[in-house]
Amino acid sequence: MKKFNCIVAGICLSASLASAETIEWSAGSLGGGWYTMSAGIAKIITSENQDIKIKVVPGGGTANPSKIQKNRSQIAMGLDTVSYLAVNAKGMYGKKHDKVSLIGQGLSDQILHVVRSKDAKYTNIADLLTKGEDKRIAINKVGSSDELVFRWIMEYYNTSYADLKKRGFKVVHGSYSEVASQFKDGLVEYAVVKLGVPGAAVIDMLLSRDGEVTTLPADLMSSLKKNWGYNSGTIKKDTYKGQNKDAVTGNMSTALIASTDLSVNTVYKITKAICENEDKLESIHSSMKFFSCKTATVDASIPVHPGAAKYYKEMGYIK
């Protein structure tokens, strides 16, 4: 009888595993923060849901929405602003990505830092771009999301790289460490980078040279939100040397996106597993320290997946 029960149990277990739903999760580059985060969260989900199997694969912020749309992946890491562009066929996306939906955002924040040296003439980016001449700016590499936001800012102020060049500006692009070196060595007066807070490159800049992180004008932020789904964020006073007041600026939030083809039940279980294990997220990656399911859909720039919405409604996080 025991042998029979064991055989039956084995058959049932095999049947259960065979019927498990396999989901591909597109992360970031191997060895990067997104890959580490994805692998860790996937482990939490599968440990609590034996009927879900997750395969984590490399991906990227701009590529992941298209992988979801084409059903190459069913879950992916993303940036809230980039996801908004994909869903609304803006920027680099020529077609609406109508299969892209949100599970939650705020996993980690990427805050825009517009840094000025203490002796720089202009105290805000509006005056710099509309009145400035012969100024020097260092920005992250062309094609980066940092540089993309700078292009949006230039567009708002009716200027461009070509126009700045005519006015004697020198704009240099490079890695975060190269931008920091340019600022520290006095080769530029302003630096534009998008980093988690506190950003190592900005710490380096402001420990070596007096300066501050500036606030973006409210009208600019309103336009960026309306046209590009770009949200605001705050760098608290005393975050950096010389930072004697809060700086309100732009924020791209790391989001977890999912295909609308995934069932309500599956995404509900995924959301539930994440939210009931929030206390484990920081140990996976320190940038997830402040993530909260209570605020995971605040300022959502794309539709929330019905499965995630079902869980959030049950918990009273959304109406």
Kindly label every feature range from the protein language model.
Residues 43, 76-83, 96-123:
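N-terminal Rossmann-like NAD(P) cofactor-binding subdomain of oxidoreductases
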Residues 2-10:
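Sec-dependent signal peptide recognition
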Residues 127-151, 231-301:
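Ligand-binding clefts/hinges and TM-proximal coupling segments of bilobed small-molecule sensing domains
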Residues 178, 185, 190, 195-209, ...:
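An extracytoplasmic/periplasmic, membrane-proximal ligand-sensing/linker region
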Residues 53, 58-76:
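Divalent cation-coordinating acidic motifs and surrounding scaffolds
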